[in-house]
Amino acid sequence: MDAVGDRMFEENNPFEAVMGRDDLNGLEKIREMIRLNQSDRDRQDMNIQSIPILKNPRVLAGMIDANRRVLTPYFYRLIEEGNRDGSIHTEYARELSELIPILTSLWLAPSVFPASAEQMLHKFRFIGEMLDRMGLPVIDEEILGLAESHFREFEAAEEKRAEE
């Protein structure tokens, strides 16, 4: 499962898709990366069907390691770019670049912290407000809508799986 997910990420890396764009500032690149990631249906379907990570500590450790090695440096580069171009105003680029992948891959994972779609959306809003207060106003209405759709689809898939 990890190798398939890694290959899918490499083939359709939303960070690489925005890195070289000169028409976007750092903040806009992060928002666009989130939009691209949310629109990647194959990866989302795989996430919905992924094994419960709490039952396999190796999967959990591998996910945390991949976040640290892969996602954190991408977030750091984009946050620093935003600091330089003035679209982001934070003293915590490194800390935020480490925290965002942990929050989005663990805290928002219903297999780790069971939650309804409404509860996940509430958590997502909390993350958005926290990031905003830290000088990284990344969650806009469009991204909030994408997250809501994703959480509702996940909840529907879980309900369907429970009926089978």
Language model segments and positions:
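Active-site-adjacent scaffolding segments
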Residues: 17, 26-32, 36-39, 43, ...
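C-terminal peripheral helix-coil segments that are non-catalytic and often amphipathic
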Residues: 73, 77-80, 84, 116-164
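Hydrophobic alpha-helical segments that form the core
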Residues: 37, 90-110, 122-134, 146-153
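Short secondary-structure transition hinges
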Residues: 45-88, 94-95
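Secondary-structure edge/capping motif, primarily at the C-terminal ends of alpha-helices
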Residues: 18-22, 48-52, 111-114
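A short secondary-structure junction motif
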Residues: 11, 37-47, 82, 107
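An amphipathic alpha-helix adjacent to DNA-recognition modules
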Residues: 1-20, 31-35
